[in-house]
């Protein structure tokens, strides 16, 4: 009976379908198999032109994909036979990570379902999963003029938001939000499709400020009506594009940007047992009058969504500020070192610096130095998401625990060691001369001048092993004479700093 009701209402569920569906058969067993799955089959006949049929099939595929996103255990075998030619496509996932949102929904969190990125394999800068933030549920109000049944319960909206792809480390490019995708779901996780694909925007969503105060984040939203059905992604019901600001264009921004995913789940809650047909009636009410219901409940809806988006974008905003500060600091450090290198009058000092980073000239030295600083700071300030930290922990311990637990310190150390090994191997090739210099210096006996009391300003080096090396180098520089004291002292100190930089790039042994 439920399946026949589904057939009767499928035209309203999929408004993009122009075909008139005719029930021909219902086959399959309704008893569960060994895996606990209840299979069934529905076959329909349609009579329409091939081009129209192709569009209708795309609409159905999109509907099935949206169901899979919140019901990953369901599998659909979608077959189309046209003029004797049969084509079959299977919709379903196996062993993919999900996140229970607490409202009975298990949401797929693999980013590949939501965005298509040519360079998505760059795991250095982005996590392969989204990390949704669940908002607080609010009750929706039904306008008095909306004709329909009397509901013995409440309509509850629960938002969830996430950035896709999710940044996990500091990269050389600032992350910017380039688009917003909104996905609508009704009771039992059934997709809500509000209108035809020719006019996919309702009055409520045409006003870009109805959901979130985007000006708070200096974002200007424009409704995006160009939704391509012929893509292997779950398509949003509502989409906005973000206009690039002059500030974004003046900085090194990720050209593709991030997408803010916003999931709106509308469910029905009642103090009495809810019948299947009652749920279907609520679903029909939502597909017909959701726009009016959202307008009537505008204040509570905007408050809940704003709170959820604030939590997501505040993290994004703080990360962007930290990245800008880090980039500015790196530029200052590189410029300071370059001023010492180019200002030195000793060719041996400049040659040693270039050899340390295997650079042919000062321009290449600047480029490599900036790259080295950037890579090292990425490893030092690594912000790994809990899923990938746990994944590496599982490989290390060979256990079978959940993937959403919080990381421990040992996991973070494991990641830092793993990420620094490749850079360590590359940089060790430039260090033999440095080690040779240290051996020569340590083999020398201290001269009387080295043992003599130093001026107060000469003891400004920190009281650490590095500081002692600075003082020893300074003492040795005093012996040959006072004429060239300034330049030679500067050369020795900065040569030692370059040496220290080479050592810093190599991972230190564990405690």
UniProtKB/Swiss-Prot annotation:
One of its GO terms (biological process) is meiotic DNA double-strand break formation. InterPro entries: TopoVIB-like (IPR028040). It comes from the Eukaryota. Residues 408-422 have a biased composition (Polar residues). The keyword Translocase does not apply. Keywords: Chromosome, Disease variant, Meiosis. Detected in lung, spleen,colon and in skeletal muscle. Expressed in the ovaries, Fallopian tubes and uterus. Residues 440-451 have a biased composition (Low complexity). Its main location: nucleus. Residues 398-485 are annotated as: Disordered. Residues 466-475 have a biased composition (Basic and acidic residues). One of its GO terms (cellular component) is chromosome. It is found in: Chromosome. Expansion of a polymorphic CGG repeat within the 5'-UTR of this gene may be the cause of folate-sensitive fragile site FRA11A. The expansion is identified in the 15-year-old proband with intellectual disability as well as in phenotypically normal members of the family. Belongs to the TOP6B-like family. PANTHER family: TYPE 2 DNA TOPOISOMERASE 6 SUBUNIT B-LIKE. This is Type 2 DNA topoisomerase 6 subunit B-like. The lineage of its organism: Eukaryota, Metazoa, Chordata, Craniata, Vertebrata.
